[in-house]
Every structure is written in C-alpha cells, then in structure tokens.
Design a protein with these regions (language model features):
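Short S/T/G/P-rich N-terminal loop/turn motif that feeds into the first structured element of a domain
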Residues: 1-61, 70-78, 94-110
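Short, conserved catalytic or adaptor-binding loops enriched in Gly and charged residues
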Residues: 89-92
Length: 110
C-alpha cells in the first residue's frame, strides 16, 4: 500500500475511525495496485482526514482511516470504485476481515 502515514495527523476530536482488520489470501492478484488506488481515492473524498496501516509477518493487517463524520464514511463505502474493490476483496484477497466504526472522543500522545 502506498505509504500511509505511520502516525496519522488528525484534528482535535470528535471524529470517526474506520478500523479494517484483515487476513490476506496467498498471492497478490492485483491487490497492491488496488490498495494503492483505494488510499489515493480515499484521500480525495470529502471528510477524509488520514489513514494508518500495518501488516504483520503473519499476514494480519490493520488499516485505520479517519473521517470527519458518519456521512463521509457512508459516502466512501458507497463509492463505486470502492465497492468494486470491496467485492474483489471478499471474493479474492481476504480469507477473513472485520470492519469496525468508532467515534474518537479523545486522543493524546507524544
């Protein structure tokens, strides 16, 4: 995936986090190209704030995208190109996945 920020820079809360946890199937089959495109496209969407993504050696991946509001998340989920990627993911790229949406009420760090 094209270099998402390792530690996302977000505005002061509240905002929303979409947490996508997945385990990949074997082989690329166009995955990296599509993942790069989805990050590029998400960054262009109204309400998009940032994205962070990590993948472990065991294939477990956690991608967190941050959004200004629920309407922006819904619009992204319904985006035609994103829906195409979702279908391909369910059919080809993911052996397992879970999506969670959370309201960030507080954040802090160094």
């Amino acid at each position: 995936m094209s270099s998402p920020d390792l530690l996302a820079k977000t505005p002061p809360p509240p905002y929303y986090a979409v947490i996508f946890t997945s385990r990949r199937t074997q082989g690329d089959r166009g995955y990296m190209r599509m993942a790069d495109r989805m990050v590029e496209l998400a960054r262009q969407q109204p309400g998009f704030l940032a994205v962070e993504s990590v993948r472990g050696a065991d294939g477990l991946c956690i991608t967190v995208s941050y959004w200004a509001d629920k309407g922006s998340i819904t619009a992204w989920k319904r985006h035609v190109e994103h829906q195409t990627a979702q279908c391909a993911g369910q059919r080809t790229w993911y052996s397992d996945y879970q999506v969670r949406v959370a309201l960030v009420e507080r954040d802090y760090g160094k």
